[in-house]
């Protein structure tokens, strides 16, 4: 009888700790991606120093007003609409109480980091990956398929979950204000953006993906309000002009 009680207590502890284990695993995966990126950047920097090459800091040379008039691609629209199911899946996963004792499963496919996003205002420093699969959104930021490449004239869309853990992923994106800076770093360049537009839209409102004909726009997408996935919090920024 005593053994049975001990087993039940241990089982309860393990089940209660399950959400923490999942969050810790996601954090570990994120840190691994960041460390791998930093190591690759370090190796690349050493090679470039030998060859005389340097990373370029790119800014927008076009001072025209925004003209978000081109419709987004079908792939971009599908990626955006697909976030509804993904956010709901992740939210349900985080909201579930101790009912699940299923062990944490490692990512089935390797995830490759294509860049980093840094938002000093909210102390965010996150890996960016191609695509917006569940595996990607659980550990970092995904670039929507079909949106513009970084620095290109058009609209580059990035999405991340508003994790329940304070400061993790896009948890604090609601604190962003117009004029705040966002930096995107890739293997080849650094892109500096300034926030100019913040809004909340419905999950079906793909107008936020419209492409500028004159400027490089960055659009950040996350679920809103916190703990639900009923709407989308959108933060838009444009590539800064050269000083």
Map each language-model feature to its residues.
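Solvent-exposed, non-transmembrane regions of membrane-associated and secreted proteins
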Residues: 2, 8-177, 181-189, 193-243
